[in-house]
Amino acid sequence: ADSVVLLAQDYHVVQIVYDGHGETGEDFISVETTVDEVTDWLQAHSITRLNAAYGCSLGGACLTRFLALGKIPVERAVIDAGITPYRMPLILRRLACLRDDLGFRLIAKSRKVLETVYPPERWTMPGRDPVKEYDALAAYLKTYSKRTVRNIFWSANNYTLPTKPAETGCQ
């Protein structure tokens, strides 16, 4: 969030908050639905190109699909730890989704597990209070509905891409 404030001093910034990640109470449905909604919103606001786009994790998956569809040109893109669809049999994809779903629930339920899997001394930014950071993170993880968690893990690993991605010249 600090980077958004800094960038907004010199650029017009659009920050996407996906369903299931904010305070709307709506569940996340899919990468495809999210990308369609973002594209529709940008077009409705007469945004016909983007100078830059950034996506991390699920955001990287959404940005990957957004770029592949090529409905709105993007000059530069950064995909950080972006998720691409699995290329394995359905049964293995279902087992991976179950593993991820159960792992998330365990981390969200137990502060001890959260801190064991993601040690605060490694994941807390310098100068920040790890107790406050992890209090906020633990509270935030509890806001996800079971449906949102399941849909995120299923969709992020199984979304569709066009057979031939759009040629946009994005760097």
Q: What positions do the PLM features span?
A:
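Conserved alpha/beta-hydrolase catalytic His-Asp/Glu region
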Residues: 88-89, 108-166
